[in-house]
């Protein structure tokens, strides 16, 4: 687990890339752009944000080891246009306190870069696919077996987040998800070991 250390500052993206390359290990990175449709002047605009990420990834030669994910799909659209060699993952959540899908409104969600769920018969996997993402990463409680099956027909990689309970990890592995995002990789490794799955 992380521990706070007074006086420490977060590493820059380039510093992180250098550290990973110096390790000699085949580490992959899932980079999340922390942007919202309501960010306003508090953050760079989506195109500038995407350019900054793409420039850092390319400068470090890390394109094959990076996926860029976001709830705000505007940055993902720009990343896809600027650097189609960099993978993108569409994040979604439908909960009482945070809902990027806005299924009940019937209108396009501001999180989805103009994409409208209604144009895809209410299918979130189809909307993700139409957006250009090849990975769909949803709040784990929102994933259904029907959605997973539909995502499979669209050849989407399915990565639920953030799964910290070993029983839920086991259930989702049995369903056939492609991977799991967790705060506790040691727990996931234990579940994988129990299931005799190869460890990364």
Task: Describe each model-derived feature in a short phrase.
Residues 1-96, 108-120, 129-140, 152-154:
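Metal-dependent phosphodiesterase/phospholipase catalytic core, i.e.
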């Amino acid at each position: 687990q992380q521990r706070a250390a007074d006086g420490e500052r977060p590493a820059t993206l380039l510093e992180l890339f250098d550290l990973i390359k110096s390790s000699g290990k085949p580490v992959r990175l899932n980079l999340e752009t922390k942007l919202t449709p309501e960010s306003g002047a508090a953050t760079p605009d989506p195109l500038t944000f995407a350019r900054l990420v793409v420039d850092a990834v390319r400068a470090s030669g890390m394109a094959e080891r990076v996926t860029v994910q976001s709830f705000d799909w505007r940055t993902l659209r720009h990343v896809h246009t600027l650097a189609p060699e960099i993978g993108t993952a569409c994040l979604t959540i439908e909960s009482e306190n945070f809902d990027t899908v806005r299924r009940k409104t019937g209108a396009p969600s501001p999180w989805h870069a103009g994409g409208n769920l209604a144009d895809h018969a209410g299918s979130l996997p189809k909307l993700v696919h139409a957006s250009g993402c090849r990975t769909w990463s949803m709040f784990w409680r929102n994933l259904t077996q029907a959605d997973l099956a539909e995502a499979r027909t669209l050849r989407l990689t399915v990565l639920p987040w953030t799964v910290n309970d070993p029983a839920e990890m086991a259930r989702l592995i049995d369903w056939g998800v492609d991977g799991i995002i967790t705060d506790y990789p040691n727990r996931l490794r234990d579940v994988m070991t129990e299931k005799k799955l190869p460890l990364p």
